[in-house]
């Protein structure tokens, strides 16, 4: 059955990934992702909001389903259309080539190398602003000196002691 013969009910019931396979098989050529989605919208008479969640799932399925191949520029085709050599060529990462610098290039003052930061941009930023505190604040040392550790008393709550004793007694009951 051709994709154009689908009814709205069939479009509602069928997954977008299966419809995309049928559509690409019918057309026999690669299609842009957005054109595929527009085709589905027209078939099912959908608004964008109505199929938004289905489109998200469709894109995930399109990337994971082995029947499809992204041939670049958001163009999708069927993997069956391509030989193994074609697939490797289409999906192989491209390597960006750089020129090797010679002695003359290294002396060029106007040449900017990759990874070099422009130091001039940071000249107007002060090392410390007025609203920042210094790490070695003398007031902090004064506070530490004012605390006498021998004056600190830790009071134990009697209720907590009673509960601990009860827990200990309960454990002895289990051993007996």
From Swiss-Prot:
InterPro entries reported for this sequence: Asxl_HARE-HTH, RNAP_delta_N_dom_sf, RpoE
GO annotation terms (biological process): DNA-templated transcription; regulation of DNA-templated transcription
Location of region: Disordered: 114-176
Domain HTH HARE-type: 14-81
One Gene Ontology term of the molecular function aspect: DNA-directed RNA polymerase activity
Top-rank lineage group of the source organism: Bacteria
Compositional bias ranges of the Acidic residues kind: 116-145, 153-176
Entry GO CC: DNA-directed RNA polymerase complex
UniProt entry keywords in alphabetical sequence: DNA-directed RNA polymerase, Nucleotidyltransferase, Transcription, Transferase
Described function: Participates in both the initiation and recycling phases of transcription. In the presence of the delta subunit, RNAP displays an increased specificity of transcription, a decreased affinity for nucleic acids, and an increased efficiency of RNA synthesis because of enhanced recycling.
Quaternary assembly: RNAP is composed of a core of 2 alpha, a beta and a beta' subunits. The core is associated with a delta subunit and one of several sigma factors.
Protein family: Belongs to the RpoE family.
Name of the protein this chain belongs to: Probable DNA-directed RNA polymerase subunit delta
């Amino acid at each position: 059955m051709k994709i154009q013969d689908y009814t709205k009910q069939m479009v509602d019931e069928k997954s977008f990934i299966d419809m995309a396979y049928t559509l690409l098989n019918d057309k026999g050529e690669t299609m842009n992702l957005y054109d595929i989605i527009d085709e589905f919208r027209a078939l099912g008479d959908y608004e964008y909001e109505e199929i938004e969640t289905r489109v998200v799932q469709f894109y995930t399925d399109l990337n994971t389903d082995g029947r499809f191949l992204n041939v670049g520029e958001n163009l999708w085709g069927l993997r069956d259309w391509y030989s193994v050599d074609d697939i490797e060529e289409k999906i192989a990462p491209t390597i960006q080539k750089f020129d090797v610098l010679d002695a003359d290039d290294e002396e060029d003052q106007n040449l900017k190398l990759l990874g070099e930061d422009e130091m001039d941009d940071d000249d107007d930023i002060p090392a410390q602003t007025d609203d920042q505190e210094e790490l070695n604040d003398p007031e902090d040392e004064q506070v530490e000196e004012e605390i006498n550790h021998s004056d600190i008393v830790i009071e134990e709550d009697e209720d907590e002691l009673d509960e601990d004793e009860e827990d200990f007694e309960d454990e002895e009951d289990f051993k007996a």
